[in-house]
């Protein structure tokens, strides 16, 4: 398959979910084009590493001021700040009319707008990897965080995110999440009680790096 993989941050060994997905797809013989945003020069080495196994890696600089400007524009609306934080249309414009791709894969709530853009301007199937249910994370942070600023930010965006995620899960050909809990909560948010096309794909574990050390004694 020829896959257009859109990530609103540079995949690396810290942002392991998109990194492992991209690498695994490439190892299986798929042609993967990665579109991603970078925010600082330190990420250039990660970008060069992606080029070792991706067909194409297309990047755009995303300065912090632009993310803040995006958020300021939606503050008076009902849309969550996360939905526009990483919005940079120049990232995808060169690819909108390329019908050679079999599927578009977009990651995270911050990347979902790119998927919506493709749904509006092309006929290519779009998969959205929500990763986590952000509503669930905001509910936890607003109730449990000891950081007052974090609690305030979570409460500010919570209702917007609940409504938006409930609408968003029905906009794509397939939705992916990391855990059954995230699937359950996203499904409960779905507009009009519809059943969205959500699949659970857990984060993988590289067994060549993570395995029991037989030299270390364990408690029975």
Which role fits each region the language model picked out?
Residues 104-105, 170-179:
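A short beta-strand/loop micro-motif in the catalytic core of glycosyltransferases
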Residues 64-82, 125-166:
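Acceptor-binding helix/loop patch of EC 2.4 sugar-transfer enzymes
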Residues 35-96:
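A conserved catalytic-core segment of Leloir-type glycosyltransferases
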Residues 1-58:
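N-terminal subdomain of nucleotide-sugar transferases
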Residues 136-140, 187, 205-219:
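Acidic anion/phosphate-binding donor-loop and adjacent secondary structure
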Residues 181, 204:
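Carbohydrate-associated surface elements
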């Amino acid at each position: 398959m020829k896959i257009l993989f859109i990530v609103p941050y540079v995949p690396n060994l810290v942002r392991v979910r998109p990194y492992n997905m991209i690498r695994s797809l490439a190892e299986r013989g798929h042609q993967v084009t990665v579109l991603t945003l970078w925010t600082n020069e330190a990420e250039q080495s990660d970008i060069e590493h992606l080029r070792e196994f991706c067909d194409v890696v297309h990047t755009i600089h995303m300065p912090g001021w632009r993310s803040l400007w995006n958020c300021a524009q939606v503050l008076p609306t009902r849309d969550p700040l996360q939905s526009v934080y990483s919005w940079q249309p120049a990232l995808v414009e060169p690819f909108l009319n390329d019908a050679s791709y079999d599927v578009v894969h977009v990651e995270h709530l911050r990347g979902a707008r790119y998927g919506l853009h493709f749904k509006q301007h092309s006929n290519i199937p779009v998969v959205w990897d929500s990763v986590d249910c952000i509503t669930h994370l905001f509910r936890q942070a607003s109730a449990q965080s000891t950081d007052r600023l974090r609690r305030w930010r979570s409460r500010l965006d919570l209702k917007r995110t609940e409504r938006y995620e409930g609408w968003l899960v029905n906009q794509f050909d397939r939705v992916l999440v990391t855990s059954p809990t995230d699937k359950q909560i996203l499904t409960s948010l779905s507009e009009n009680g519809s059943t969205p096309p959500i699949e659970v794909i857990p984060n993988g574990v590289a067994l060549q790096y993570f395995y029991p050390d037989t030299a270390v004694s364990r408690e029975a």
